[in-house]
Amino acid sequence: MTKLSTLALSAALIAFAGAAAAEDLRIGFADPVSAIDPQLNNYAGDHSVSQHFFPAIVAQKTIGGMAPGLATAWKNTSPTTWEFKIRDKAIWTDGKPVTAEDIAFSYERAQNVPGSVASFKSFLRSVAKVEVKDPQTLVITTKEPDPLLPINISSIYIVSKHVGQTATTDDYNSGKAMVTDGPYAFVSYTPGDRIEMKRNDTYWGEKAEWDKVSYRYIANPAARTAALLSGDVDMIDKVSFSDIEKLEKNPKVKVWSYPGLRALILQPSFNPAPSKFITDKAGRPLDKNPLLDVRVRRALNMAINREAIADRVARGGVTVATQWMPADTFGYNPDYAKIAVDPTKAKALLAEAGYPDGFKLTMHVPGERYPLAPETAQAVAQFWTRIGIETQVEVVPFSVYVTGANKNDYAMSVIGWGNGTGEGTYAMTSILATNDNARGLGASNWGRYSNPKLDEALAKAGAEFDDPKREAIIKDAVKVVMDDVGIIPLYHYKNIWASRPDLKVVPWNSDRTVAMQVSKVK
């Protein structure tokens, strides 16, 4: 931080301004929003916004697990058939009733939105047929038994058929198609800036706490902190790790920290072709991709001192990750609780693989997308350089980054994965399964990792209704992936918010930031 920004922050600490009126809430959030079309992209920021306007058929919360959403009840009527009872009092903001027709339409649309680069298709991969039995009854038939169907469709937000069937993403962004049925109603959207909303008095659920909500995008962590301290916003998310200690000492601020599910993960490229981002020490292209050799991947994995990164880079705002799920979650394998740091063995593995002198590698990372990702990448680069792999970090805008990552252009990419379903198969489906767009598998498998044993485990877990048996399958999958170093997990973010002291902030689901998690202290 520069001397000027430090002085500005100090001044803000002293001159913390007054808050907004009690009935209004102003949130400063970090995750960019690609659109307010709730079915365009499976992005964290888009999810957070959508939950204000478009409930799912089943609700998922960090506290309490699954809960009724638009469906009041659901059950298996056969191993491959689910029946959902839809609320009879849910209405859209234009006064028309919410029916099973809207839900059936939404599941079709969510798989085919033009311009999507992060499809929701994986959540519906097991679905063979969706039928409307009557206005309040939806029947979903799956291709095979799928115990995770309710939790998967909790991530797909329902839009109105009578508006959505002719609406484009631009129509949602402009407000033309924003006929909603959530706790808040749409007021306006300024791309790259903010979303304005108001309480929806026709909402079927619990009455919203706030009359009006201003949801403001502030990408820079220091700027978010300054906005809170100056009174421009009432709450911020993803608090800068460097600001936590200062804020905790400020009586005019309350810091809220909870364990998180989101992992920062490195994805090696499994492209068999040589990469321009991997060369010998003289800058000449190699004749093959060294990352295809598991000995090289193991060397990279064991060279990283994750504890040092957690302490020195993240300043305690993360917990070390040794697999994609954190400890004490469904599918975590305690046999892989630690990755020993061993640079000497790493060098020996490189020599054994035919790279005694190492090589050069460029790692790509998006700027201002995942908190501390560029700084973390630089730290990883130092650890790898020490074992002979001279690593350069290239930070690029996310819009550019995601295009290259999706095409597997990069030798090493970085992804922040939310594990939003709270169990291990979500990551298996999206970032580990062999890429198959038609089946909705591997949508975010940017490195194009492919392991038949992992794919087999995913299929078995997806068809197993017995929880202990399903968890055992996921734990076995952890062994498969981590022994093979299909990914290189670094850490799990803690979910950290800061607010005015008269507000209470509780976790919602995954690391989402929504107005519904904020209340006035009684």
Could you say what each language-model-derived stretch is?
Residues 75, 119-165:
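Surface-exposed binding/hinge segments that line
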Residues 316-335, 496-500:
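Mature extracytoplasmic/periplasmic domains
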Residues 59-62, 75, 83, 87-118, ...:
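Extracytoplasmic/periplasmic ligand-capture domains
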Residues 490:
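Glycine-rich and polybasic anion-binding loops at the starts of cofactor/ligand-binding domains
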Residues 21-29:
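Cleaved targeting-peptide boundary
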Residues 1-21:
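Gram-negative bacterial Sec-dependent N-terminal signal peptides
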Residues 28-78, 108, 115, 177-180:
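N-terminal lobe/hinge region of extracytoplasmic solute-binding protein
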Residues 349, 497-522:
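Long beta-strand-rich cores associated with HINT superfamily self-processing modules
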